Amino acid sequence: MKVRPSVKTMCEHCKIIRRKGRVMVICSANPKHKQRQGK
């Protein structure tokens, strides 16, 4: 999982979601696209 100041979708399978107040990107096609916003 990448931790970034700003998360963006990398492909058409990426979805932006909120979990426990954090913005995250989950991807069904490519697990390398998983991201989380913040420190």
From Swiss-Prot:
Signal peptide: none annotated. InterPro entries: Ribosomal_bL36, Ribosomal_bL36_sp. It comes from the Bacteria. GO terms for molecular function: structural constituent of ribosome. Keywords: Ribonucleoprotein, Ribosomal protein. Coiled coil: none annotated. One of its GO terms (cellular component) is ribonucleoprotein complex. GO terms for biological process: translation. Pfam families: Ribosomal_L36. PANTHER family: 50S RIBOSOMAL PROTEIN L36, CHLOROPLASTIC, LARGE RIBOSOMAL SUBUNIT PROTEIN BL36C. Belongs to the bacterial ribosomal protein bL36 family. This is Large ribosomal subunit protein bL36.
